[in-house]
Amino acid sequence: MTAIYKKELKSYLTSMIGYLFMAFTLALFGRYFTAINLQQGYPEIGYALQNSAFILLIAVPVLTMRVLSEEQKNKTDQLLLTAPVKISDIILGKYLALLTIYVIPVLIMCLYPLLLGTHGTVSYAVSYTSILGYFLLGAAYISVGVFVSSITESQVIAAVVGFVILFLCYVESGIANFFPEGAGSSFFAFFIIIALVCLWIGSMIKNPIITGVIAVIGEGALTTVYFTKSTLLEGKIQDLLGVFNMAGHMDNFVNGILDIGGVVYYLSVIAICTFLAMQSLQKKRWN
């Protein structure tokens, strides 16, 4: 894993993409820092971080688009897959290299509360808790980008799909408002979701019988709940969509609350996405 980490980190530090990512991230944060903290005199940097976080929707997919897609396009992924190295080491090595690139601007942001402290009273606990939330949000976004890059050999497709996924998560609250809170809308939405999940499982295991059994059990259980106790489904599609609201979990950190639930949430997103990337790569190894 160390060799892969060093190789990947070097590739980003010897090309423009890593430096452009850091420059754009710091530039947009600096703009909001100037407007909110310097011009308006706000003593904590949480709101500047929260407002500038949307740049990650664009910057992260651009940063991560090549991490695995380029290997597949150049066929160098075959060297990795046939080498005596674990799939987990490949994914984690690449993910940690990307995280290192992201950590550099975050560490620079840690200097801003000290700058504010020279001009007045600053709650360092609130500011650095906000930075922690910002770091975890970006780390989760990067894991999504790594997973998307693992399923396509096109860097452009990886960047576009990554942006679309992160953008949909960003506007989740607006999407949730389109759905009525009644049981019928939840039933319809979950019916489609179960079907899509079964299609994905079928593409992974290549066994139509097992896939069909899973589909029948899932759709059957959902239908039974709907016709026997539909109240259990009321508002559940909104609850499900809320799970994908990654940016929303940053709110408590911005308010100076060290939200353990938020930390667990972000770590769970990272674990799930890196696991899915490992499974995607594992499938290619056996193919």
Regions flagged by a language model, labelled:
Residues 32-35, 155-252:
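Transmembrane helix segments
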Residues 29-36, 40-55, 97-164, 170-181:
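Secretory targeting signals
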Residues 88-92, 148, 281:
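Alpha-helix N-cap/helix-start motif at helix boundaries, enriched for small hydrophobics
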Residues 1-71, 99, 111, 127-132, 159-160, 200-215, 222-236, ...:
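Hydrophobic alpha-helical transmembrane segments
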Residues 67-97:
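Helix-loop-helix units of permease transmembrane domains in multi-pass membrane transporters
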